[in-house]
Amino acid sequence: NAYGGTAGSADDISNRLITTQNLGKTTVAELGSSMGKVIPTAAMYGVNLNNLASAYVTTTKNGIATAESTTYINSMLNELGKSGSTASDTLKKKTGQSFKELMDSGMSLTDVLGILQESADASGKSMADMFSSQEAGKAAATLVQHATDFNGAMDQMQQSAGTTATAFETVENTTAT
């Protein structure tokens, strides 16, 4: 509900959740019990479901459990969006736009985090230094260090149509024999 109609139909959402499960180290059940805690924050800052699901793929694939990923991603999004935070102020200074404006313009999370990484590198800081909480810093660092995973997941989210039907057919064929 936090996304309104922008997340797509129930089938579209199901396709993306199954794709997240298939690419990451999580289950649809774990996502179902965790994602609701971060979706309002994501929606508030213009982070669409493809970006959010790709963040889950990347964090869980790289050893962060689903529930922890929720906490880390939520912390990261809050700091990126909260005026006065180092991350938010750096984005505004470098681009002239807020985090939400950057997301609304079509940038991905890794595009935005790449801007922060460049700024951190230029000032001799780490990505973790751009965030006040360890959780937010860990999420950001994981997404930047594994941007290839994130970008691959984003591509798969775009092509996820039919994933639910395929999964259903697999279950049907498995139980039929």
Where are these regions (language model features)?
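Carboxylate/His-rich catalytic cores and anion/metal-binding grooves
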Residues: N1-T6
